[in-house]
Amino acid sequence: DGKTGFLLWFQAKIYQIFLQRKKDKIMMATSPVESLSSGFIINIELFFITLLLALPLGLVITFCSMSKFKPLKWLSRTFVWIIRGTPLMLQLFVVLYVPGLLFAMPISSRFTAAVIAFVINYAAYFSEIYRGGIESVSRGQYEAGQVLGMTKTQIFFKIILLQVIKRIIPPLSNEVITLTKDTSLARVIALAEIIMCAERYTKQGLIWPLFATALYFLVFNGILTILFGWIEKKMDYFRV
């Protein structure tokens, strides 16, 4: 009715004002450096939360996609196919708007919407990396473990796991570094990350924030590259 419509409109306006003030608080900081740093913190938070949730979720999807129960197997693979076959930008819009449009359950926090979209997207990619690593181990090693009287769990953790980790580190590190750059896509749902902050100052005639933004990403990705290189070096003793 009219009252309900008015209340919904009023609630939407209040949220819009609150969101705008939150964005302005970040982008109108005391200095461009502070604004860019605040924006990059959002990128970093999105990055770490995505990794924390997507890595284990990807493993669950992997086990489902390799299950002998065919409905679960094909459901998992269809999910991965859809997620990998559609743009992450589109998935951000879907997560933010579809729950409210179809189920009257809008996601009030844009950061939460971004986290959900990124976790779903990267879990699908990680699951394929895991699956490729597991399937690359020869069947004979499973059979050898069975001959020795080991259970399936013992075979996986004592024989297979280290080989899988060794093989998936390069593609996994590539996806992780890609994730750092993909966090900038959150700006399409008005999340004030670093590129949105830099763009605001660029429109005011400052060009250096763009180079500062590149420096932020280069330094962070450089640290990740060194970290994964160290991990690979530590595992060089284990030849596969």
Spans of features found by a protein language model:
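Transmembrane alpha-helices and adjacent helix-loop boundaries
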Residues: 10, 14, 20-240
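Extreme N-terminal basic, low-complexity initiation segments
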Residues: 2-11
